[in-house]
């Protein structure tokens, strides 16, 4: 079934988002487990720490989105990579905006 329980409420997903999120989590965990990718993630951390994480992430989102249906055919891994780099971009966004968003939240909810 396409539902889950959140805050004691039943929610029906229209586009199987719950399954997609589970699949994405498995994909991400596998990328961390793969030996050859340990250096890749170390490089990604250096890029993010160097202040270039957003451009790097957006560039990879575009790369894999454009590649879908071409280089490897309709490879679901290209879509999972788009989502993973989107999460990295969200992480970078949150790092760069954490203080201002926290202050904005406090002012809206006080």
Question: What are the language-model segments listed below?
Answer:
Residues 2-110:
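Intrinsically disordered, low-complexity regulatory regions
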């Amino acid at each position: 079934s396409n539902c889950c329980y959140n805050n004691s409420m039943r929610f029906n997903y229209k586009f199987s988002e719950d399954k997609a999120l589970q699949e994405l989590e498995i994909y991400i965990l596998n990328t961390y487990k793969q030996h050859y990718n340990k250096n890749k993630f170390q490089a990604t951390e250096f890029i993010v720490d160097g202040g270039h994480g957003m451009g790097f992430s957006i560039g990879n989102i575009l790369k894999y989105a454009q590649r879908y249906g071409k280089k490897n055919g309709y490879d679901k891994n290209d879509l999972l990579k788009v989502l993973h780099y989107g999460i990295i971009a969200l992480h970078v966004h949150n790092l760069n905006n954490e203080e201002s968003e926290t202050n904005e939240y406090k002012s809206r909810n006080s």
